[in-house]
């Protein structure tokens, strides 16, 4: 009996990439491969790549160089680059790393088995053409047994001037509601408690599907999808990401308030707190529009948590315009902001814009914004002190094996004493005893805590 071939996947970038990696891992295991913790022990190495920022892209090339050297010594090694760098670079990757066997864009993740068959037949394969994304019936190899990603829409039709995503992930393609519900029902049967609906621009869900209502709305929207999946037995929590302010609606907020399984957490990038910068970014909304969304959320769901993304030092951004971003962060009081200094990406209009800012300015503004974000997050955390929060226990605290960790409905990370063997996958009441900017510590109040 032959020894099973081993595979290793390294994933860079966003939640969409993580979900794609889980699907590709499932395909490989369906083909008989087994997981290897170490890339150097694997017979197949796959890098699922991100090109949103230059440093992530350069890290990929560093990893690839090491595996290319290994393949020269071990010709049977299968070397694959998937994801956004693969889509962006295409055949030029083969010139840069001729040891590669397969270059495949994100739209081809579900076709990995077919593409591998071509590789095994002796071909060096580049799969970056735009295709209809096929439904995948293979079981993903998910990183968690408690929470799961569920892709509902692929691609993006927006044309933000700094962003390469539409170029590498293609046009928007929504999955049918019935297929999404079927996947969630399967997850529930496997014991999953929480699902996160994923889309690069999830508020665009359904606008490419046929049909409209008598009122002129799209027949299928994210709001309608939440109602479609909400009653799946066994699923206790529903989240979604990432929202776009241009398409975010009050109807969606009211649905979230009405549906008890939908968590009180919204991730809505604002990117800049200055209208002129937003216009240069082609974001399609104003600061005032963003603040109205925040106001609506807090009017309808007062305890909701709001997180965001922000970019500093966009080409031509003045000190005054940057300070407008600081003002917005202070005014909203976000629970979390993912921050980044602007990084020019090939093929985007902003990369060729005049007035590119220096690295010194970028790092100064990033540091100042991060300081304010942490301060605001610490202030927001204070409201949890002494409260009892429902926490879904997911794992052992990697820094303290005597503790478990999980998340509140508002997505705050919580640590508490206990053993994962007893608590994994449980929704437990936790009294919060300590707060920090981005995490909480508490004490489990349920009877199960007595055995911890």
From Swiss-Prot:
Record-listed [4Fe-4S] cluster 1 binding positions: 14, 50, 84
The record's free-text note on cofactor binding: Binds 2 [4Fe-4S] clusters. One cluster is coordinated with 3 cysteines and an exchangeable S-adenosyl-L-methionine.
Keyword annotations: 4Fe-4S, Cytoplasm, Iron, Iron-sulfur, Metal-binding, S-adenosyl-L-methionine, Transferase, tRNA processing
Cofactor or coenzyme needed: [4Fe-4S] cluster
Subunit structure: Monomer.
Class of enzymatic activity (EC top level): transferase
InterPro entries: Elp3/MiaA/NifB-like_rSAM, Methylthiotransferase, Methylthiotransferase_CS, Methylthiotransferase_N, Methylthiotransferase_N_sf, MiaB_methiolase, rSAM, rSAM_horseshoe
GO molecular function: 4 iron, 4 sulfur cluster binding; metal ion binding; methylthiotransferase activity
Organism ancestry: Bacteria, Bacillati, Cyanobacteriota, Cyanophyceae, Synechococcales
Record field: catalytic activity: N(6)-dimethylallyladenosine(37) in tRNA + (sulfur carrier)-SH + AH2 + 2 S-adenosyl-L-methionine = 2-methylsulfanyl-N(6)-dimethylallyladenosine(37) in tRNA + (sulfur carrier)-H + 5'-deoxyadenosine + L-methionine + A + S-adenosyl-L-homocysteine + 2 H(+)
Name of the protein in question: tRNA-2-methylthio-N(6)-dimethylallyladenosine synthase
Alphabetized SMART domains for the sequence: Elp3
Organism listed in the record: Synechococcus elongatus (strain ATCC 33912 / PCC 7942 / FACHB-805)
Family as reported in the entry's similarity comment: Belongs to the methylthiotransferase family. MiaB subfamily.
Residue ranges of domain Radical SAM core in the record: 142-379
């Amino acid at each position: 009996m032959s020894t099973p071939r081993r595979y290793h996947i390294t994933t860079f970038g966003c939640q969409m990439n993580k979900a794609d990696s889980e699907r590709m891992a499932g395909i490989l295991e369906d083909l008989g491969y087994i997981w290897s913790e170490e890339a150097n022990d694997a017979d197949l190495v796959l890098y699922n790549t991100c090109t949103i920022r230059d440093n992530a892209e350069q890290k990929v090339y560093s990893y690839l160089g090491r595996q290319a050297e290994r393949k020269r010594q071990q010709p049977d090694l299968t070397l694959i680059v998937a994801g956004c760098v693969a889509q962006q670079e295409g055949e030029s990757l083969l010139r840069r790393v001729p040891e590669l066997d397969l270059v495949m864009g994100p739209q081809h993740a579900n076709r990995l088995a077919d593409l591998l068959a071509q590789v095994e037949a002796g071909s060096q394969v580049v799969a970056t053409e735009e295709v209809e994304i096929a439904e995948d019936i293979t079981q993903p190899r998910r990183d968690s047994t408690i929470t799961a990603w569920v892709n509902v829409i692929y691609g993006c039709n927006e044309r933000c001037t700094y962003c390469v995503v539409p170029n590498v992930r293609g046009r928007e393609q929504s999955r049918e509601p019935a297929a999404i519900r079927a996947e969630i029902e399967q997850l529930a049967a496997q014991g999953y408690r929480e699902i996160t609906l994923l889309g690069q621009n999830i508020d665009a869900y359904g606008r490419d599907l046929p049909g409209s209502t008598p009122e002129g709305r799209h027949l299928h929207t994210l709001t309608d999808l939440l109602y479609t999946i909400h009653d799946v037995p066994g699923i206790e929590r529903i989240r979604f990401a990432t929202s776009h302010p241009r398409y975010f609606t009050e109807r969606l907020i009211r649905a979230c308030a009405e549906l008890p399984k939908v968590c009180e957490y919204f991730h809505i990038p604002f990117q800049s707190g200055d209208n002129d910068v937003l216009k240069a970014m082609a974001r399609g909304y104003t600061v005032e529009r963003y603040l109205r969304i925040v106001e609506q959320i807090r009017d309808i769901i007062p305890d909701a948590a709001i997180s965001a993304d922000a970019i500093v030092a966009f080409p031509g951004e003045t000190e005054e315009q940057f300070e407008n971003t600081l003002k917005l962060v202070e005014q909203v009081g976000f629970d979390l902001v993912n921050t980044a200094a602007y990084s020019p990406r090939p093929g985007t209009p902003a990369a060729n814009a005049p007035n590119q800012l220096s690295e010194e300015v970028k790092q100064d503004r990033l540091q100042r914004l991060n300081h304010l974000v942490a301060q605001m997050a610490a202030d927001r955390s204070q409201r949890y002190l002494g409260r009892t929060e429902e926490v879904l226990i997911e794992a052992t605290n990697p820094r303290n094996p005597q503790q478990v960790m999980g998340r509140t409905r508002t997505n705050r990370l919580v640590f508490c004493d206990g053993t994962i063997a007893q608590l994994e996958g449980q929704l437990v009441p936790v009294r919060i005893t300590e707060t920090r900017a981005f995490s909480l510590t508490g004490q489990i109040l349920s009877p199960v805590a007595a055995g911890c």
